[in-house]
Amino acid sequence: MDFDSALNRTDKDFPANALRMFFTSNHDENTWNKADYETTPGAKHAPFAVMTQTMKRSIPLIYSGQEEPFLRAIRFFDKDTITLGNYQRENFYSVLLHLRKVNPALAANASFKKVTAGNEDAVYAYVRQNGKNKVLVILNWSDKEQTIKIADKTLYGNIHNVFTNNTQNVSAKEWKMKPWGYAVYVY
């Protein structure tokens, strides 16, 4: 997957302790390349936003109003007020930000291991770990349903899905992930 090439390139180009800034949009992107809700509309936004919050050696960038369905580009050089009130993505971002804040597995210095979980052209999965704290992230970066199968037996067990707030059994059994789907599990 091209994303791995980009990560590998940053591993080579930057010092080992350098932090990357990941984002789905920002003020400049919104101004020049359309509003966040246009470039990654609806469900398409979520797996990429999950990545920005859970990737190795990273700092996520969330810009003003990203939790709001702001449907137009922001003026760049003039004051442009963002009217808030709907907060369509508020719960989604609250879960991610809370997890990042309280779980040491998402610290900048926590380990990162890519995991095979299905069609690698569409599914990107990885484990972040720091001591006994471990987080499994599975992302469907496609508009098609994907079959998920975890081959790494060390990841099997009853684990907590932070978005459903339920315990799920992860095993060799296959399951389906909806288009643009995502799952984040805490061990």
Can you name each region flagged by the protein language model?
Residues 8, 72-76, 80-117:
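Aromatic- and carboxylate-lined catalytic core of secreted/periplasmic carbohydrate-active enzymes
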Residues 121-123, 133, 179-184:
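Short hydrophobic/aromatic beta-strand or adjacent loop that forms the aromatic wall/cage
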Residues 126-131, 187:
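Active-site beta-strand termini and strand-to-loop segments that position acidic
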Residues 138:
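Short hydrophobic beta-strand that contains or immediately precedes a catalytic carboxylate
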Residues 170-187:
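C-terminal beta-strand-rich structural cap/linker in extracellular carbohydrate-active enzymes
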